[in-house]
Amino acid sequence: MTAKEIYFAGGCFWGTEHYFKQVAGVLETQVGYANGKADCRPTYKEVCTDQTGFAETVRVVFDADVTDVKFLTRMFFHAIDPLSVNRQGHDEGTQYRTGVYYADATLRPAIQSVFQEVENTLGQTLAVELLPLRNFFPAEDYHQDYLDKNPQGYCHLPLELFRWAREQKP
C-alpha cells in the first residue's frame, strides 16, 4: 500500500467528507481549515467571520495502489459547482470556496490535467483554486464524521451523489 494525501475544499466540509468516504481507495478523511492567513489553529466561529482566509477542507488519504489523484479530482468536480465563487449549495462565504490543495508538488500535473479537462468541457474559467497547501488545522471533534454521527444532519450534497460515488471505479 502506498498512502498519499490531497486536500479538497468543496463547500461545507460535512458533505464533502462523507462523499469522499464513499470513494474506492480512500483510506481516511479529516475535516479542517486550510490555506488561511494565520499559522495558529482557528475555531469554527472564527472561520465563519470571513476574516481568517481559511477554507473548510477535507484531508483525503488514499491508497495510490488502488486509485489516483486524477480519479479523485474528477470525483471532486462531480460534487461541486466549479463556476461558483465562495458558494456551494446554500452555503455562502469565503470559507466555502472551492479548491484543491496539495502537499506533494508531484501531484500537481495530474490535478492540473483534470482542471484543464473540466475547463475545456465547460468552456469557461473555473472558480476553483489549485494551490500548494500552506497550512491545515483539523476542525473541532464534533465536525469529524459529522454525517455518520448525525445521519439526518444538514448536507448541501444530494443523497444520490453518495450512492453514485460508491459505484464509481478508479
Model-inferred region functions:
Residues 1-170:
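Flexible coil/turn and secondary-structure edge motifs
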